[in-house]
Amino acid sequence: MQQTYGLERIGLMNPKVVYRNMSPAWLTEQALLNGEGVLSDTGALVVRTGKYTGRAPDDKFIVDTPSIHDYIAWNNINRPISKEKFNALKSKILAYFQNRPIYLFDGFAGADEHGWSPRGIFNFEGGCYAKCINLNPEKEPYIYNAIKAGTLVENVVLDEDTRHPNYFDSKITENTRAGYPIDYIPNAAQPGKGGIPTVIIFLTADSFGVLPPISRLSKEAAMYHFVTGFTSKVAGTEQGITEPIPTFSTLFGEPFMPLAPDIYAGMLGERIEKYNTKVYLVNTGWTGSPYGIGSRMDLKYTRAMITAALNGQLDNVPYRHDMRFNVDIPQVCPGVPNQILNPRATWDNKKSYDIMAKKVAAMFYENFKTKYPDMPEEIIQAGPRV
């Protein structure tokens, strides 16, 4: 009698065979035998994901029960489904698996979830899920060199003869990806645990080109920007996105944060105050002008700013308070030209910058007033000024 590893407890009966925790090499071989992918010239398994080449946030539902009803932020992303409908869908899936081979893996689900416990921060993931579009070995050597045997590559076009990946070809999708184990990155911190964070970095991508590339936030401002979650959806991250779309995604990841936002904001504020953690907002978006005219923030400058923040090199430098966005901007940062730190200075037309900055600040104001009218006044006042 074959081992089923307790799958019958979730109703999964009569599998043809169960393969559990098999090696990447074995799984790659099975995928090739099943015609599910091909090998690149570096030995990576390259597959196509069909018509779904990005997240499908409209397909998320939560079973609505009395025990969770009052804690969920019900909206067009967190949509309720009855227990009866859930059980019907589950039965359909279980029926599909009858007499089929099952590939079982013991691990956590989720690509980028992490946690903060009283003992410190920790990662749930055991690898990286990197974007590959326009991948350049000079600018991103770690990702480029990680695409080898044991790596799963999605929707990247291969040369028919050489099987060499063409990372600049987006005819399948802009959202080309590579998933690889964490130990493929030479400087990865393992086992994915750290102490209490002394610095928190919020990443945003401003397609308007007006937010500073790095700014320091007070506790209240950190809670404001955490709840607001301003960024831009960039090409390929979701179906149908071909150019950046400015968006306010609650908590910088509304599709992944099902609880009411004030719960998460309160948790963050408590930890910032308890541990005296510094918080910075880093803009990886556009500089010099909006998308289409300006340029994307150079990755080397972003890395230099984050390194300086983490190393405490921004603790004692002079700061300038930006009255429009209500944040403190460092005047100097190692490895970054001073002009880059001041977004207004990067625009040729300063009047155009002022007009755009006022427009973006008004967007912040209207979004917060509409979505979070009951937030504490000190958090509301920590946002941009109209």
Locate each region found by the language model.
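A noncatalytic interaction/capping subdomain that flanks phosphate/NTP-handling catalytic cores
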Residues: 1-107, 118-386
